[in-house]
Amino acid sequence: MYKNKIIQTCIIYILYIILFSSIIRTKLAKNNIKKNITNIIAYSIRNENKFLVQLYKQKKEKKKLFIKNYELRNKKRINYLKTIFNSLSGSQFPQNSDIDSYNLTPKLKKTVQFFRSLSDNPYNKSQHVILMGKKCQPMPNELKTRQNQVLGCQSTVYIYPKVKLQDDKKVINWLGYSDGLLTKGIVYILIDGLSGYTPEEILKVNPNFISLTGISDFLTMSRINGYLNIMNKIKIFSEQIIKNIEH
């Protein structure tokens, strides 16, 4: 009996040792797992931070390169646009960028000064042009004739001169229409800036003034050509009014 009790006690003791060892190993394993997870997270964060820093540097370098290339492209584009304007408009750019060299009407001069005061942001300027287009007065359908249509525009455009005598002089007020948002804004700039003046004053205006506003920087070549066609149509009407040709 005594031996059996000793054996049972030893077995229970051994089982307790095994159980206790198992518990300790489990805790150690959990601690190791937590430690490993912590190390993995810390390693991931360090690598992620390195990656973000590297990515930021790359973006910064790309931005510098883009700005540098943009400045070069823009310089070439401005020179190219001058050549295009000179050839299409038949008017030469003045030797200096003085606003008075373009023979602008007071209204057009005010418009140029407004666009010059805006930030040099093509999108921002294009939105202002579109907003200006909403100021166009409706044109009666009977005036939307072939004779009043501006050909060679990307959008449909009509221009019509309303002539009145003022101080024994012929003064023109213009009506304009376009189904294109951006083109409509350009139409408004022209009809507003050239309304209330004599045909002689209108004919003196150098169409290349659009380059002073920065608008030509974001126009496609087809829209630049369309703008010059609108100006040409206005000048043809002005010449006809001087010659007493009725509309």
UniProtKB/Swiss-Prot annotation:
Quote the pathway field.
Answer: Cofactor biosynthesis; iron-sulfur cluster biosynthesis
Catalytic residues, chain numbering: C153 (cysteine persulfide intermediate)
Major location category of this protein: plastid
Q: What happens when the gene is disrupted?
A: Essential for parasite survival.
The protein's UniProt keywords, in alphabetical order, are: Apicoplast, Plastid
Q: Which Pfam families does this chain map to?
A: SufE
InterPro entries for this protein? Fe-S_metab-assoc_dom
Subcellular location(s) of the protein: Plastid, Apicoplast
Cellular component terms per the entry's GO annotation: apicoplast
What family does the entry list? Belongs to the SufE family.
Report quaternary structure and partners. Monomer. Interacts with SufS; interaction enhances cysteine desulfurase activity of SufS.
Q: What does this protein do?
A: Participates in sulfur mobilization (SUF) pathway for iron-sulfur (Fe-S) cluster biogenesis. Enhances cysteine desulfurase activity of SufS. Probably functions as a sulfur acceptor for SufS.
**UniProt protein name:** Putative cysteine desulfuration protein SufE
Q: What is the phylogenetic placement of the source species in the record?
A: Eukaryota, Sar, Alveolata, Apicomplexa, Aconoidasida
Annotated gene: SufE
